[in-house]
Curated annotation (Swiss-Prot):
GO terms for cellular component: periplasmic space. It is found in: Periplasm. This is Tol-Pal system protein TolB. Residues 1-34 form the signal peptide.
């Protein structure tokens, strides 16, 4: 049984879209949520562009000590740093902390090689609502030049999302790329020696605001977001064998999709949200199938005695990348859903699997196995170039950020003594980060779409 807590007060238009995708789904019989995870940078930040995010200033006469104003700036700084594009300067190294644009002295920042800074203010109203404003400033000109600014009015519970939204605006202004800081991730958490050892969670991309949407005594696997961000498909063994289900996030309702004898797995929504691809073994070997989600009609896509699984749609809704051992060892192939024409895509080493196609269809992230190691690899579909991005032992389940800048994956450290955790890596492999948590094993991470409705 679920309790669905929805928004009750009118929010700005931009935040209404966010709020609908962030329903707080809480089990009535689960008294507390997990402690938030946090991101620890492990490689690559020094090569990024320096930027300073000044602690935001409180301008209210009724200062509320329950909110740390510095938290908003720190969230923005962390977002920009996590993007791999920016190196945010620690607060203790700032030459000065201006509170308004007219206080900015460009020569102070020039000495540090910093030409972009962020200023902001927080006004706390008597009704405990908040007005957040920011200025993105170019300090290479004298006087300093405002290149972007905005203001938001929200309740306290939305402050963290406002910070992420500001990060999105700053990131897009400076890079021309849509920010993905308001997105969510889903993953399976296994806690050993627990009555319900398997739980499906959703959280902010950075591990904050974790919410359990399903818990089970039996395994949960392979969560997949719908393109509109309203549903998640996943595999459950609650009935004693594998089943594919789709859960609506705003109601918690779960619909059984397929439950054939044998294996039912690897769900993947088409970009237009009209179809669901998956793998079944009802004929003996694993083959790909597609369901029309409106009619429920199922069509078999591959028809051979090999194992064909892990489908990932191309953005054209007409082609699917998948894993097949039809050549002897697992490799990545592409199949056209209308003609069923098949093309091999990967050639790196002897084994590649678990493909994830970028939202623009220009590259694939996959799992490469070679010489006893399992790494995340990238296949450039424009040039055919293949490259290893990580140096790991058991990296698995890669998921590309919806703006195609980062990859999220699960990993077990090389010493094999620690649990599986989540890690981030930039598309070029230069930036790496570890999402810290003190829970159990985290598996099957998947990134939400860019625009949650």
């Amino acid at each position: 049984m679920y309790l669905i807590i929805k928004k009750t007060h009118k929010l700005p238009h931009w935040l209404q879209k966010v709020s609908l995708s962030i329903m707080l789904i809480i089990f009535l019989w689960k008294p507390a949520l997990l402690a938030d995870m946090h991101i620890e940078i492990t490689c690559g930040v020094n090569a990024a562009h320096p930027i300073a995010v000044i602690p935001f200033t409180c301008v209210s006469n009724q200062y509320n000590k329950s909110i740390s104003i510095e938290d908003i700036a720190s969230i923005i700084a962390a977002d920009l740093r996590n993007s791999s594009k920016f190196n945010t300067i620690p607060v203790e190294y700032l030459p000065h902390k201006p509170t308004k644009v007219s206080d900015v002295i460009p020569t102070f920042w020039e000495k540090l090689g910093i030409n972009i800074i962020v200023l902001g203010t927080v006004h706390i109203n008597y009704d405990e609502s908040y007005i957040i404003s920011y200025h993105l400033i170019d300090t290479s000109s004298n006087p300093a030049l405002i290149i972007s600014e905005n203001q938001y009015s929200v309740e306290k519970k939305w402050l963290r999302y406002v910070a992420h939204a500001i990060s999105n605006e700053i990131f897009e202004k400076l890079t021309g790329i849509k920010g993905a800081f308001c997105t969510r991730i889903a993953y399976v958490l296994r806690i050993h020696n627990d009555h319900y050892p398997y739980e499906l969670y959703i959280s902010d991309y950075d591990g904050h605001n974790q919410i359990s949407i399903c818990r089970s005594t039996e395994p949960l696997m392979s969560p997949a977001w719908s393109p509109d961000g309203k549903k998640i498909a996943y595999v459950t063994f609650a009935s004693g064998h594998s089943e594919l289900v789709i859960q609506a996030l705003n109601t918690g309702l779960v619909n059984n999709i397929v439950s054939f004898p044998g294996h039912n797995g690897a769900p993947s929504f088409s970009p237009d949200c009209k179809k669901l691809a998956f793998s079944l073994s009802k004929t003996g070997s694993l083959n790909l199938y597609i369901m029309d989600l409106e009619s429920g009609e199922i069509t078999q896509l591959t028809k051979n005695r090999n194992n064909n699984t892990e489908p990932s749609w191309f953005p054209d809704n007409q082609n699917i990348a998948y894993t097949s051992d039809q050549g002897g060892s697992p490799q990545i192939y592409k199949i056209n859903v209308k003609t069923t024409e098949i093309q091999r895509l990967s050639w790196l080493h002897t084994s590649n699997q678990n493909p994830n196609v970028s939202s623009d269809g220009t590259f694939i992230i996959m799992v490469n196995r070679h010489q006893g190691k399992q790494n995340i690899a990238k296949l450039n579909l424009l040039t055919g170039q293949e490259e290893i991005l990580t140096d790991t032992l058991l990296a698995d389940s890669p998921s590309i950020a919806p703006n195609n800048t980062m990859v999220l994956y699960s990993n077990i450290n090389k010493d094999l003594t620690t649990k599986s955790n989540l890690e981030l890596i930039s598309i070029d492999g230069h930036f790496k980060a570890h999402i810290q948590g003190d829970q159990g094993d985290i598996r099957f991470p998947t990134w939400s779409p860019l625009h949650l409705e």
